[in-house]
Curated annotation (Swiss-Prot):
Residues modified by glycosylation: N300, N355, N386, N394
Pfam families in the record: LBP_BPI_CETP, LBP_BPI_CETP_C
Protein location: Secreted; Cytoplasmic granule membrane
InterPro entries: Bactericidal_perm-incr_a/b_dom, BPI/LBP, BPI/LBP/Plunc, Lipid-bd_serum_glycop_C, Lipid-bd_serum_glycop_CS, Lipid-bd_serum_glycop_N
Keywords from the UniProt entry: Antibiotic, Antimicrobial, Disulfide bond, Glycoprotein, Immunity, Innate immunity, Lipid transport, Membrane, Secreted, Signal, Transport
Keyword Chloroplast: no
Signal sequence annotation: 1-25
Gene Ontology biological process terms, A to Z: acute-phase response; cellular response to lipopolysaccharide; defense response to Gram-negative bacterium; defense response to Gram-positive bacterium; innate immune response; lipid transport; lipopolysaccharide-mediated signaling pathway; macrophage activation involved in immune response
Keyword Transit peptide: no
Principal subcellular localisation of the protein: secreted
Protein name: Lipopolysaccharide-binding protein
Length: 481
């Protein structure tokens, strides 16, 4: 009878219905799918939440009159109505194709107590009453749409209620007399309650749920460099079996948001129904993240002597590099070296069935550090490597880990003559494995956050890798505490 912004459907709608318009292309970077199983769980939780909320509902007073033989017309008023107990025995939340959601409650019971007053000219009488309302049935259709601002709009498109039976017992002075006309009073009580049920529901959606949805953010912070845009690209798509909600799913720079030059791919989602909720995350989300961190210089690195282990026989100076570049020690005796590396372009993560991979192309330039603090370039290298990736799906985010392949080094330019590329490959492999990749993996371990609100917990996760996207399935638990 009453919805509340604290109940699971409100939280679920808040998670799913966060609209903005104007994305590049028509394809989302993230899709959330709710199955029948998920909707059944929502209906069960809503029933428990409503049962708790009903005890706090203020029912309206109502009045009327009855004609009593020898007394004439008697005006009565029922007030101070309180719900003493309620049993909501059945509920269902179903999809309305191309519209939204249908929520129903059936075969429910409420017991109400309160006070009554009777007025007949100078006659003033009062007492208490007890009402048992049986066989309550409520049917509500929710229309899901969007505002011009891009945020969600939820409205009650239809509402109906029916009460099978009302039993009124009146006590107090002349209560026995009013009980003689309980049929009239019960009929009046039924009509008032049936009209108020839908009024309360519509008011709750309009004054509580809709304003709540308007306050929902459409972006979230990942770290000081990046944020996630999980605004929706259109109205949720309801079919008879599932509800698909399309998010933009773009990682953006928090300092300087720039347009992305590529589009999200089409995701052909499998027909899976064993979990309550599924998340389909395209390579668009991960590759926009790669753009952000590449542009911020996060993938750049510098190798100096202080990052070489103290017990290493190879130091970052011209004496040690004599094995790679024989002339360098003669041209710059006892001089420290610095290697500056940068990934040429943002690595692109490739999804294929059961496999994740990427390729990185780096450029490394070496400088000798002269006594006057001048850095003089001496050689330039091109470095290529293939990397496999592993992903883990936990209760709130996706984390990653890179497993690097062997690097390939090519000499692009040398100002110090002949070069032993193979030996330098071994040195660079050591550094990348022990410094560069651990830094990247630490960042990947922080994870890609899923668009969840507080009190929503995921469990029994599964992860599948398909062409161009990840497909994650999970069950949902609403935490009451």
């Amino acid at each position: 009878m009453v919805t509340s912004t604290g109940t699971l459907p409100s939280l679920l709608l808040g998670t799913l219905l966060t609209f903005t318009s104007g994305a590049l292309g028509a394809n989302p970077g993230l899709v959330v799918r709710i199955t029948d199983q998920g909707l059944e769980y929502v209906a069960q939780e809503e029933l428990l939440a409503l049962q708790s909320k009903l005890h706090k509902v203020t029912l309206p007073d109502f009045n009327g009159d009855v004609r009593i033989k020898h007394f004439g017309s008697v005006d009565y008023r029922f007030h101070s109505l309180n719900i003493q107990s309620c049993k909501l025995l059945g509920s269902a939340l179903k999809l309305l194709p191309n519209q939204g959601l249908h929520f129903s409650i059936s075969d429910s019971f409420i017991q109400v107590t309160g006070d009554w007053k009777v007025r007949k000219r100078i006659l003033r009488l009062d007492g208490s009453f007890d009402v048992k309302v049986k066989g309550i049935t409520i049917s509500v259709n929710l229309l899901l749409d969007s505002e011009p601002s891009g945020r969600p709009k939820v409205a009650v498109s239809s509402c109906s209620s029916h009460i099978r039976d009302v039993e009124v017992h009146i006590s107090g002075d002349l209560g026995w007399l009013l009980n003689l006309f309980h049929n009239q009073i019960e009929s009046r009580f039924r009509r008032v309650l049936e009209s108020k049920i839908c009024e309360i529901i519509e008011d709750s959606v309009t004054s509580e749920l809709q304003p709540y949805l308007q306050t929902l953010p459409v972006t979230t912070e990942i770290d000081h460099l990046a944020g996630l845009d999980y605004s929706l690209m259109g109205a949720p798509q309801a079919t008879a079996q599932m509800l698909d909600v399309m998010f933009k799913g773009e990682i953006f720079s928090r300092d300087d948001r720039f347009p992305v030059a590529f589009l999200a791919p089409v995701m052909n989602l499998p027909e899976e129904h064993s979990r309550m909720v599924y998340f389909a995350i395209s390579d668009y989300a991960f590759n926009t993240a790669s753009l952000v961190y590449h542009k911020a210089g996060f993938l750049n690195f510098t190798i100096t002597d202080d990052v070489i282990p103290p017990d290493s026989s190879i130091r970052q100076n011209t004496k040690s590099f004599r094995a790679f570049v024989p002339r360098i020690a003669r041209l710059y005796p006892n001089t420290n070296l610095e290697l500056q590396g940068a990934v040429i372009s943002a690595p692109c993560l490739n999804f294929s069935p059961g496999n994740l991979s990427t390729a990185a192309q780096m450029e490394i330039e070496a400088f000798v550090l002269l006594p006057n603090s001048v850095k003089e370039p001496v050689f330039r290298l091109s470095v290529a490597t293939n990397v496999s990736a592993m992903l883990t799906f936990n209760t709130s985010k996706i984390t990653g880990f890179l497993e690097p392949g062997k690097i390939q080094v090519e000499l692009k330019e040398s100002k110090v003559g002949r070069f032993n590329v193979e030996l330098l490959e071994a040195l660079l492999n050591y550094y990348l494995l022990n410094n560069f990749y651990p830094k990247v993996n630490d960042k990947l371990a922080e994870g890609f956050p899923l668009p969840l609100l507080r009190k929503i917990q995921l469990y029994d996760p599964i992860l599948q890798i398909h062409k161009d996207f990840l497909f994650l399935g999970t069950n949902v638990r609403y935490l009451r505490v």
